[in-house]
Amino acid sequence: MKEANQWSSKLGFILAAAGSAIGLGAIWKFPYVAGTSGGGAFLLIFILFTVLIGLPLLLGEFIIGRRTQKDAVQSYKTLAPGTKWHWIGYLGMVTCFILLSFYSVVGGWILIYIIKGFTGGLSQTSGFDTIFASTISNPYLAVGGQLLFMVVTILVVAKGVSSGIEKASQVLMPALFLLFIILMVRSVTLDGAMEGIKFFLMPDLTAIDANTILYAMGQSFFLLSVGVSVMVTYSAYLEKQENLVQSAVSVTVMNMLVAVMAGIAIFPAVFSFGLKPDQGPVLLFNVLPTVFNQMPFGIIFLLAFLLLFLFAALTSAFSMLEILVAVLSKGDINKRKRFAWLGGIAIFIVGVPSALSYGVLSDVTIFHLSIFDAADYLVSNILMPLGALLISIFVPLKIPKQDLFDELKSGSNLKRKWFAVWLLLIRYLSPVAIIIVFLHVIGIF
């Protein structure tokens, strides 16, 4: 694969991998859950689980991809020939396909709001719940926004790894952090901002219970894009001498940093204007527009936030489409553009029902969930945990111990004792933790 596609620099890989992991959930859901689940105490538990569960799994995917330098399906075929383990790669493809089909819908909503912001459609100080409802229920806006988001994603992925995904990530990721810093400074300087900071960061041990711990455990690998073989695909484009441990730590730290920065940027502003903190689309499309349009030059800060969310959505979308393109093109750069468009169009078509699930298809439900929510539930609660579990079993079972050490040792000074710790974590702690979280989210306990 490396003859056709390769990262031009280690930094480019780290930014692209971090961009893949930094999705909308890290910005609009995680801070709220942290604030309502123990604040600083929850953050400490999350960081602990990320180091003990998420990071070992991320390294496992890096090893699979870099050792074989093949796509998500061929990697498993190479490491476990004559077996069915390569179905992990197909599972990752299907998961990313479904995920991007409804993720692109949210990306479309963001694009519509950005257009509304630049054309004066978000200049009022109230009534944003009505604007949001009319946006997502309008079939032309919902599907049109989704289509525009997918076209941007396809154009970037079609250009290749270094010329497309890497270059885009090198622009979008620094821009994302810069916007975060600007918005953090503005947010914490507002009157009453301290209440928001306390909500997010003040440790509250009374809020820590079994559910909180289980959620922190689940987020420790969900927020790193582990379990869908995206990181297998991205690491396949790495040179053999690159330091996998350093890269994995960098991606993990950047992801945790964004989650913390999001809380500091959002909640001081929300509390400053006496509004209730919320999560998900309500936060982005209702609460934040109300907040920023009540302050001087508020539309500028609102547009900055919308752009920030757009950048996070795009960098994740690139990786979801890339795993599909990599498998279908089999590393042939001449076929990349064709499969990027074919795959992207197929994802768009499958995602149209999700785009219409709050409008003309609002009466259609699957197990009492809208089409959009049903797809989200399938990916988040079933497919991703299953993929993460299979990878945690595959790595120590099918890759020889010495090969694992050689991959982690390459480009680093990793000691045997730390390798033994990592192997212990991915072999025992990771699968047990994933099973516990899975049983919890499906309601068994």
UniProtKB/Swiss-Prot annotation:
Signal peptide: none annotated. Its main location: membrane. This is Uncharacterized sodium-dependent transporter YocR. The gene is yocR. Belongs to the sodium:neurotransmitter symporter (SNF) (TC 2.A.22) family. Keywords: Cell membrane, Membrane, Symport, Transmembrane, Transmembrane helix, Transport. Putative sodium-dependent transporter. It holds the Pfam family SNF. The lineage of its organism: Bacteria, Bacillati, Bacillota, Bacilli, Bacillales. It is a multi-pass membrane protein. It is found in: Cell membrane. The chain crosses the membrane at residues 11-31, 39-59, 95-115, 141-161, 165-185, 212-232, 251-271, 295-315, 341-361, 377-397, 419-439. InterPro entries: Na/ntran_symport, SNS_sf, YocR/YhdH-like. One of its GO terms (molecular function) is symporter activity. GO terms for cellular component: plasma membrane.
